[in-house]
């Protein structure tokens, strides 16, 4: 398996990985148009996990959220749009992609706080050491805000860093 940044030729496949979850009743062509025009999708950096035959197994989007650090100097990133094709789910590809991407990015810039909004509950991400933020930090009822913090950066349950909590991304 190989981790790499997504290329232009990958985007239709990437977008369709999430059609069942985020299609909201749109036709496939309308859904693709929505994805292609999404500011959120254009502002982040896409990563994919592919097999040795170059088949895309999973994808995710990394957002630089340093604008939330309120001058603390903390490096903050968001992980979003994590998706795997239906027929490849429950085989560990999403977890593998998350771990590899975080490790890859941390080689160049040690990230202090990784945020994500879970649309699938906490269990999947808890296995990857993400913790749900306390209820007073939650900004959505339909998605759970979770964080993975570098040691000694932020104990989610005991203190509050001087940062802004991200809206859904």
Language model features: what each stretch is:
Residues 44, 141-145:
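Short hydrophobic/aromatic beta-strand or adjacent loop that forms the aromatic wall/cage
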Residues 48, 54-67, 76-83:
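Conserved beta-strand in the GNAT
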Residues 88-100:
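Conserved acetyl-CoA pyrophosphate-binding loop and the N-cap/start of the following alpha-helix
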Residues 109-112, 118-142:
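Conserved active-site alpha-helix within GNAT-family acetyltransferase domains
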Residues 1-51, 55-57, 152-169:
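Short amphipathic alpha-helix that is part of the acyltransferase structural core
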Residues 44, 74, 79, 111:
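Short coil/loop residues immediately preceding or within conserved phosphate-binding loops
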Residues 79-90, 120:
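A short, internal acetyl-CoA/4′-phosphopantetheine-binding micro-motif in the GNAT/acyltransferase core
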């Amino acid at each position: 398996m190989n981790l790499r940044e997504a290329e232009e030729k990958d985007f239709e496949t990437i977008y369709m990985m999430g059609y069942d979850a985020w299609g909201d009743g749109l036709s496939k062509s309308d859904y693709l148009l929505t994805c292609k025009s999404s500011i959120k999708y254009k502002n982040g950096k896409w990563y994919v996990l592919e097999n040795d035959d170059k088949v895309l197994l999973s994808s995710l989007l990394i957002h630089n959220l340093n604008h939330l650090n309120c001058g603390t100097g903390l490096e903050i990133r968001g992980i979003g749009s994590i998706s795997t094709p239906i027929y490849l789910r429950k085989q560990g590809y999403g977890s593998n992609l998350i771990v590899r991407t975080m490790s890859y990015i941390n080689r160049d810039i040690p990230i202090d706080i990784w945020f994500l909004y879970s649309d699938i509950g906490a269990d999947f991400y808890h296995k990857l050491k993400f913790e749900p933020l306390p209820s007073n930090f939650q900004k959505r009822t339909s998605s759970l805000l979770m964080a993975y913090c570098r040691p000694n950066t932020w104990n989610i349950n005991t203190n509050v860093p001087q940062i802004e909590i991200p809206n859904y991304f």
